[in-house]
Each structure stands twice: as C-alpha cells, then as structure tokens.
C-alpha cells in the first residue's frame, strides 16, 4: 500500500429514548500496487525466458549429483545471463519497474484502484417511557456498498470495455422486549436482515437472568441465540487472476 487512505464521516442525533446515526467511509488507493504482479511482470519483461532457462538448468545438475543448493545457484546464474542486459548509462530495470507499477493490474501492470464507499444509517427507539408493563425497543439499519476498482479487484467489466460501479444494498430491522419479575429478567428479540444478493434471514434470541443473594450480587444467565454471516464484498464480486488460478466471487451477478 502506497499513499492509501480511508476517510470516515459520522453524524448522530440521540436522547435517552432514541438515537439516529449515519456514517460513511471512502477509500483512496493512492499509488498502491500488487507486489506479486510487480515482480512477475517485471521479470517477464526483462527476462522472458527466465523460468524456462532456470528449470532447464536445474534438473540436469541435480540428476548429475549436485546438491540442491549448488544446482539452484548455477541455474539462477544461467537464467540471469539470459535476461535482457541494459546498455551502459541506462536504467532499464528501474524504468521497467516504474512502468509496471504505474500500469493497471490485469492490463499489463501491477497498480490497483480502490475508490469504494460505504454508506450506513441506523436507528433505535425505546418505548420504556411510554409503556409500563415491559421495555420495548425497535430499530433498524440500511447499508449500501458502492464499489469501484476499475476492474483491478472487482468484476465491474460490462463486456464492452467499460467499468461501472457495483452497488450492494442491505437492510435489517428488529424488535426487543424485556420484562422484570422481581429477581428474574426475561428478554426476547427477533431480527430480520436482507441483502439483495441473498435470501433474507430471521434471527431470534432469548435470555433469562436470575439475580440471587441478599444483595442480588449473584447472576445466573441462560440464553438462546442464532446468527448468520453473508459473504463480504470481495467474496461476492472479486475477479482476481493469480499464478495458481482465478479468485472469483460467488454471487450470480458476478
């Protein structure tokens, strides 16, 4: 990461009975690049036959009884001789390194772009001051992921040479009720969450807390809860070729 930054903004309104808050974050990739791609592409440009020459020299030396260390040293030396040799007074290696670093990944370079944003709003309201028999709360949230990497990380390619931002929306809402019975406190809640790329999820929870002792200093708790996790944005929309294969997001839209 080089000159990479993330900026956060937040606004909040609250009192003892409710809160509403909103925040956003935005990413600036600066001059960041993929180091693996930088090394590989620079080597391929300066020594296109390096791997073949190295492998061709290594195996025969091992088969003739040389140690792996000696064979590796000799093979690396042979491959280095096969590399493009810069002329006197030139900076071929530095120039090639700079060109690859400034080019975009998946288009002959190692640089990547991340100009993504996140928008999130949430609220909660407690009806405790209006209802006597129990404490009831309701709340919810909305979130938007606004992704853009110009095709260097996410699969924004529209198939016609253009790259468009990817937007993912999700929302959720919940209600919770709590009731005290002398030494016992019972709480139950239910929540619904929906991401546009996945089925909605219902997650109920319940708990009982019993306070024992003269001063109620001993608490015993029993609870039941459920949860889930949707894949993150990269797991949904990544498209990332590597030397071992292609990392591909799992959503249908990808």
Please place each PLM-identified region on the residue numbering.
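Face-selective signature of the C-terminal outer-membrane beta-barrel domain
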Residues: 10-157, 163-198
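Surface-exposed extracellular loop regions of Gram-negative outer-membrane beta-barrel proteins
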Residues: 30-35, 196-201, 210-254
């Amino acid at each position: 990461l080089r000159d990479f930054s993330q900026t956060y903004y937040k606004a909040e309104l609250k009192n003892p009975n409710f809160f509403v808050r909103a925040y956003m974050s935005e990413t600036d990739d600066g001059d960041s690049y993929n180091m693996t791609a930088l090394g590989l592409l620079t080597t391929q440009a300066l020594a296109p036959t390096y791997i073949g020459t190295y492998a061709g020299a290594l195996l025969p030396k091992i088969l003739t009884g040389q140690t792996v260390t000696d064979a590796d040293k000799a093979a690396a030396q042979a491959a280095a001789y096969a590399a493009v040799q810069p002329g006197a007074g030139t900076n071929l290696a530095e120039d090639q390194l700079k060109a690859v670093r400034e080019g975009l990944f998946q288009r002959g370079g190692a640089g990547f772009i991340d100009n993504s944003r996140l928008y999130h709003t949430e609220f909660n309201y407690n009806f405790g001051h209006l209802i006597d028999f129990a404490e009831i709360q309701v709340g919810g949230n909305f979130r938007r992921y606004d992704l853009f990497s110009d095709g260097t990380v996410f699969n924004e390619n529209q198939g016609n040479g253009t790259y468009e931002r990817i937007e993912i929306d999700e929302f959720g809402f919940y209600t919770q009720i709590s009731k005290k019975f002398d030494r016992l406190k019972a709480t139950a809640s239910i929540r619904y969450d929906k991401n546009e790329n996945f089925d909605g999820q219902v997650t109920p929870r319940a708990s009982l807390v019993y306070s024992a002792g003269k001063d109620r200093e001993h608490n015993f708790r029993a609870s039941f809860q459920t949860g889930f996790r949707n894949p993150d944005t990269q797991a949904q929309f990544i498209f990332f070729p590597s030397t071992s294969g292609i990392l591909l997001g799992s959503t249908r839209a990808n």
